[in-house]
């Protein structure tokens, strides 16, 4: 198995070169673990001059020759399900996983409501909190939405009542600037000033160390993230305001499934 880390742009060429070299050796089994698919937010073109970089990055897997069939590529919390269709099906097969089970292991009844900051997060994550045996959701939900006022973008609560809860945790797949998370927290506390708000993202792809300081200044009770972006996770691993959820067990499980 090859662990592909793409949280630094300078590494992309080297990572694909190494993966291609390994595949060319025709091992008995071979798979690629790519926890972070970095161009996920550029998954579509809204204007004629937009460049869909997610599809461009995925096309690099054309360089990976099949190894006794298509090469499995494991991706954690992909931004949009349609992105798996960008990968060349004759070369690789995408296997999707999520960090939600790890996060739920951190939950207690005192965590309060699960907050979904936009429609995308609601579509991605709400189903993960549904218990089929009990035929109900495990937590109450608060849903937020983005709306524009001229050139400004605001976040407001569209479903649920923050006044009913002492605590809440915002869940999203990634953050670069923490802007949406902070605005969502502000929207909750505008309705209930006493609510304590935590946040979880699968991918903490911070664009700079200033984002870390911005998160701390915003006053989140706790900020959960995985180490799918290892360089950025290293920035906060010793900071008590953050808790890093290691993807080690998910990676091992993916490798074992690939050996079956």
Positions of predicted regions on the chain:
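PRPP-associated nucleotide enzymes
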Residues: 1-260
């Amino acid at each position: 198995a090859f662990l592909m880390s793409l949280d630094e742009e300078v590494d992309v060429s080297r990572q694909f070169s190494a993966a291609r070299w390994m595949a060319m050796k025709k091992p008995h089994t071979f798979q690629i673990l790519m926890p972070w698919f970095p161009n996920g937010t550029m998954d579509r073109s809204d204007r004629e001059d937009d460049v869909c970089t997610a599809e461009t990055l995925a096309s690099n897997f054309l360089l990976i020759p099949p190894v006794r069939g298509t090469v499995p590529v494991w991706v954690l919390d992909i931004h949009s399900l349609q992105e798996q269709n960008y990968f060349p099906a004759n070369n690789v097969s995408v296997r999707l996983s999520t960090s939600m089970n790890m996060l739920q292991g951190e939950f207690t009844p005192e965590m309060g409501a699960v907050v979904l900051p936009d429609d995308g997060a609601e579509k991605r994550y709400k189903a993960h909190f549904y218990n089929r045996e009990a035929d109900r959701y495990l937590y109450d939900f608060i849903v937020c939405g983005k709306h524009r006022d001229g050139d400004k973008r605001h976040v407001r609560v569209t479903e649920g009542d923050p006044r009913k809860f002492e605590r809440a945790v915002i869940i999203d797949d990634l953050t670069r600037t923490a802007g949406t998370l902070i605005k969502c927290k502000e929207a909750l506390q505008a309705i209930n000033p006493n609510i304590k708000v935590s946040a979880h993202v699968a991918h903490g792809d911070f664009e700079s160390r200033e984002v870390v300081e911005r998160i701390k200044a915003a006053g989140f009770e706790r900020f959960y993230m995985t180490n799918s972006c290892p360089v950025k996770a290293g920035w906060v691993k010793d900071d008590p305001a953050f808790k890093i959820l290691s993807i080690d067990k998910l990676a091992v499980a993916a490798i074992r499934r690939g050996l079956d």
